Amino acid sequence: MKVYKLLILLLFVIFFFACFDRTPTRYSITDSKTYEASLFRQNCAICHGPEGEGKMLDDGRVIPNIRGGQHKYTTDQQIYDHIANGGNGMVPFRGILTDREIKQLVQFVQRDLRKDK
């Protein structure tokens, strides 16, 4: 009888822990209602993908994943300069976005997209 109680308790514990998903959820750009996510969708997603995952173009060029992996630009200033001035195939957004909007995108990339480094 004691064995059955222990078995039932063990099954209950296993079932209880199986109900919890321990994988952290990734920040979803497409579901976000923030202004920064809206800026990303309007200006960055066309090239970097709807979730910032990057992609390969038909001509073989690679648009980088800005969420994970190694990043060429890591500091706020480097990211700001790259968004504002473009380069390496990226168009400059100075004149398209305000200084404040570029800074908001920098914070969005650093705070929300790269927080799972």
Give residue ranges: language-model regions:
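Electrostatic cytochrome c docking/interface patches
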Residues: C19-L39, K55
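A general structural signal marking secondary-structure boundaries and capping sites
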Residues: T23, E51, G87, D112-D116
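Disulfide-bonded cysteines in secreted/extracellular proteins and peptides
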Residues: C19, C44-C47, M90
